[in-house]
A protein has these predicted regions:
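Acidic, metal/ion-coordinating pockets
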Residues: 1-187
């Protein structure tokens, strides 16, 4: 992204946005590195995306970002799928303060809880896209971290999502059921 920002005139569209657009994403959430270049870079990236950004724990204090907390998508067969997104709130720990100007990243679990509750009566299936990982070893339950950076197990166990799509740890989770929530994480 830094190279792109320094050479914007070479590309008509942000190259990462172009790749995601080619994939045909309908919905996506923000990741921790999306904040690395400040508000304007994030705004331009999001405006270049064809899909809808869902991130319930990011508040846009500048009013220019196309971010929604959740959406309800009705499939051709009539099934209503409620989708939300959240990003690890450890963005507040890692990110340079100037890159978070005009933004507020709130508690990921509380935002997921609010979204899950709000979607309850609006849809048949609830999905959470969580840019964060698992705080436990999934086979043994051994705690990997209690820092709060990764809370996928807590989300799966305490909230009523049907599907939890995670990403952040760069470890493959091909699929596991946790307290009635099916969870996956790409490598």
């Amino acid at each position: 992204t830094q190279y792109y920002l320094e050479n914007r005139d070479r590309w008509p569209v942000h190259p990462v946005a172009a790749a995601f657009n080619a994939m045909g994403l309908d919905y996506f959430t923000l990741g921790n590195h999306d904040f690395n270049f400040g508000y304007e870079a994030l705004r331009d990236y999001l405006r270049a995306m064809d899909g809808v950004c869902l991130c319930a724990n990011v508040e846009d204090l500048g009013g220019e970002l196309p971010i929604r907390p959740w959406a309800v998508h009705t499939l051709a067969n009539g099934l209503r799928v409620g989708i939300t997104g959240v990003v690890t709130d450890f963005v507040n720990v890692w990110e340079q303060p100037q890159n978070l100007e005009r933004l507020r990243v709130t508690d990921a679990f509380q935002a997921a809880l609010t979204a899950c509750s709000s979607l309850r009566d609006q849809c048949d299936v609830r999905v959470c896209i969580y840019h964060g990982g698992f705080e436990e070893e999934l086979e043994t339950g051994r705690v990997l971290s209690d820092s709060g950076e990764n809370i996928a197990c807590k989300i799966a166990r305490e909230l009523d999502f049907d599907l939890l799509l995670t990403g952040h740890q760069h470890m493959a989770v091909e699929g596991i059921e946790l307290s009635g929530t099916y969870a996956v994480q790409p490598p």
